[in-house]
Each structure stands twice: as C-alpha cells, then as structure tokens.
Amino acid sequence: MAKVLVVTSGKGGVGKTTTTAAMGAALAQAGEKVVVVDFDVGLRNLDLVMGAERRVVFDLINVVHGVAKLPQALIRDKRLENLWLLPASQTKDKDALTEEGVGRVIAELRKSFDWVICDSPAGIERGAMLAMRYADEAIIVTNPEVSSVRDSDRIIGMLDSKTVRAETGERVEKHILITRYDAGRAARGEMLSIDDVLEILATPLLGIVPESQDVLRASNVGCPVTLNSPASAPARAYHDAMRRLLGEAVEMQIPSERKGLMNLLLGRRAA
Amino acid sequence: MSVLRLFTGRAASAPVARERLQILLAHERSLRGQPDLLMQLREEILAVVSRHVLLDPDKVIVRMDRGKHVSTLEVDIELPNGADRAFASAG
C-alpha cells in the first residue's frame, strides 16, 4: 500500500525541504521506493537540495496539464536507485495547479511507489492546501519558537478539516518533527522545550533534529544530509525518524554533536 | 537553573513563550471553523443602524481588542451631517 506523506509547517524556513530530501533518501536507503514531489510552484528548491537542478526537463505542472507524461517528468536520483524526484515549475504561478489534476498525479504515483512525499510550500494558501489534500500522513516541521508553533497549530487544524481523509471521516496521521533544536538553550530556558511544544500541539513526536552546520553543508553540495554525512547528528535524527515512520519503536533521543571539553565547560555550542 | 541565572542575570524567556502560546492558541482554536466574527458583527450592525440613519458602509469600522481579562469591541460609525434629518424627511 502506497503512502502519501506531506511535509508541511505553515511557517517558511523551518526545514520542510531539508526534511523532505533527508527523509526521502533515508526511506529509499531502507529499501522503500520513494518519490519526492515539490509543490512549491514558482519557488522550487527541492531539485536544488537534491542536486538535480540541471536535470529538470518537465515538472509537476506539465504533468497536471498533460503536456508531459509522468515518467518523462520523474528524475531518478543518481545515488539511490529507489529515489525519484518530481520537480515543481519555476515559472508558472500557484493557480496552475488544480485539485483534480493533482489528484490524478497522486493516484498515478501511488501505483508505482511505496512513499509519495509532498514538500509543501510555506503559508496556508492554495499550494499548501493542495500539497496536503491527498495525504495519508503528515510531518509537521516545527522550530521551538513561538511563531513556528502557532503556525503548526494552524496547519494541524487544516489537516483535520481540509484533507480528503478528514472530509471522508478518516484521519490524517500526524507527526511533529522538531528541527533546529538546541538542547543547551532549551536547558537554559532560552528556548521552548520539547515537552512545551508537544504539550501545546498535542501531537505525537516523530523526531528531534538538532541545529547543525551539516544541514547547510549538505544543501550547499546538493545532497540530502542523510547521505552527505550519515554519521552527523541531524542525519542520525532523520534516520531514527524514518524508522519510527516505518513503525519501528526507536527510543527518542536528541543526537548531539561531539563537543570538546573546553566547549562543554564554557557552555558553547559545538561548531 | 536559578544558580545559572544568578550568573547570567537573565530570566528564562521560554516560560513566557509557553504561556503566551497557550493563551493565544486556546483563543484561536475556539474561533476555528466559525465564520469571521468581526465581519458578521459589522454586517449586522450596519443593517440595524442603516434602518434608522443613512450612512456610508465604508465608514463603519468594527474593531476588537483582546486583553488578558476583558476584551473590548469598538464600533466607529461616521455619520454625514444632516443624514438623520435627510432620512426622516425622506421617510
């Protein structure tokens, strides 16, 4: 049974595209057949983070409009043979997507993949609505910060009311993924704690991804962080999250960077 | 933690964030799924007042301020001079 997973957040810049790429690659490495779909029409970035920006010929809009067939638009990852990308269009605006057209593409993707991961645009407008419309499961990417938590709450409300599942009396299975977490600042009371965020959002936790330079380094070179530096703290966090998504019971922990003794003593963040 | 705060001289801000979010989200959730309350109030106030005086619908401003303990509803209706008399003589 194929699963449609939306990666969403409401707020921009919290790590949706990073998460889509990292989770997609992790699932593909675990043997699942995965397609990552960029819904950010007009501001596509998933191709860049995946390192496939020079291989884009056709895109989601072309397929929705029947200009290209789905296999023509799908780009196979060069590193993982189980991983595919369906890019967004760079030029057209968000109205180019129709609910019915997206439904057709998702239905077709369900036939050939185990996981269809939809990378949502920021906001709560049409693009974000369409990205979540056909989802079975959702990852709500949240930073431990007031505006991100508020927007996540809003998105949770939409997942519970505006999706096909919600309208047919079923539930979208929701997971919170906390990203850019800084354990030191949380311990000093400078950042909302994991418990604070979970209590406020009342949604189960999928994983905690620490703030790390490895994420930027991976996007610089166009490689999902789970592939680029598998031993890094964020990659391990995404890997654990992937296993939980597959139904494994993995103990929740916050992977940390190795800190030098001086850094620990001075309470500095590891570089 | 309090020892740490003695050294840094700063109060932890996370509890403030948490409390603000809890108050705000409780409120926003209660409004979810309902039609926009302010728009509805504005429409109905406009209907009632314009039954008695002539007014310009664009000059009706309805604003709500939410405080911690009480909220206020501010209705600002601008009436053109002589509007009520004009209306009375017309009716």
From Swiss-Prot, chain B:
Tell me what this protein is called.
Cell division topological specificity factor
Q: To which protein family does this belong?
A: Belongs to the MinE family.
NCBIfam families in the cross-refs: minE (TIGR01215), PRK00296.1 (NF001422)
**Keyword annotations of the record:** Cell cycle, Cell division
One biological process term from GO is: regulation of division septum assembly
Q: Does the keyword Cell division apply?
A: yes
User: Which InterPro entries does the record cross-reference, listed alphabetically?
Assistant: MinE, MinE_sf
Pfam families documented for this protein: MinE
Function, as annotated, reads: Prevents the cell division inhibition by proteins MinC and MinD at internal division sites while permitting inhibition at polar sites. This ensures cell division at the proper site by restricting the formation of a division septum at the midpoint of the long axis of the cell.
